[in-house]
């Protein structure tokens, strides 16, 4: 587990590493879903929705991408992705802190209802439950969570 890392703004040259980190991390979280088959879709969404409309901060060490967070100008956190090797470290906390810094009036997000680990993480980081919904992309049941200062 890495204890030292740097946060910096996303660069176009990070795309392949960010997409592979997304695939690898989500595959581990949901082994029954073939995320390799979704990479082309994700690359398009990454470029056209997230890179185009959100601030993206990456965590890296020695040039290796360890995680990233996306936050748009309305305070919506669409993606918090941290490599499995970093689960339980302070890296995800640092990325959430950066999202809060960029959106000081509040942060909202959707989290899969069956992702107990992520829900506990957000609760520990000051997020509260703000209702239930359905993910517009996957159709999965989700919780709306929010952080307010």
Model-derived segments and spans:
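Conserved N-terminal entry element of GNAT/NAT acetyltransferase domains
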Residues: 1-13, 147
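A short, internal acetyl-CoA/4′-phosphopantetheine-binding micro-motif in the GNAT/acyltransferase core
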Residues: 77-87, 111-112
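Conserved beta-strand in the GNAT
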Residues: 58, 64-81
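Short glycine/proline-centered loop/turn elements that form peptide/ligand docking sites
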Residues: 92, 96, 114-118, 135-141
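Conserved acetyl-CoA-binding loop-helix of GNAT-fold acetyltransferases
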Residues: 82, 88-101, 120-124
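Conserved GNAT acetyl-CoA-binding A-motif
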Residues: 102-114
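Conserved GNAT-fold acetyl-CoA-binding loop/helix
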Residues: 15, 19-46
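A short helix-loop-beta-strand connector motif used in the catalytic cores of GNAT acetyltransferases and
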Residues: 45-58, 76
């Amino acid at each position: 587990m890495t204890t030292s890392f740097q946060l910096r703004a996303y660069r176009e040259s990070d795309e392949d590493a960010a997409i592979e980190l997304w695939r690898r991390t989500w595959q581990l979280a949901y082994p029954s879903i073939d995320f390799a088959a979704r990479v082309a879709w994700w690359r398009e969404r990454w470029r056209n929705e997230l890179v185009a409309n959100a601030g993206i901060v990456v965590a890296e060490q020695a040039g290796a991408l360890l995680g990233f967070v996306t936050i748009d100008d309305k305070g919506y956190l669409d993606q918090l992705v941290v490599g499995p090797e970093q689960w339980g470290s302070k890296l995800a906390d640092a990325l959430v802190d950066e999202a809060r810094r960029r959106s000081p009036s509040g942060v909202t997000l959707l989290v899969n209802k069956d992702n107990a680990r992520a829900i506990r993480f957000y609760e520990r980081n000051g997020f509260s439950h703000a209702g239930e919904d359905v993910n517009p992309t996957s159709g999965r049941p989700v919780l709306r969570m929010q952080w307010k200062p």
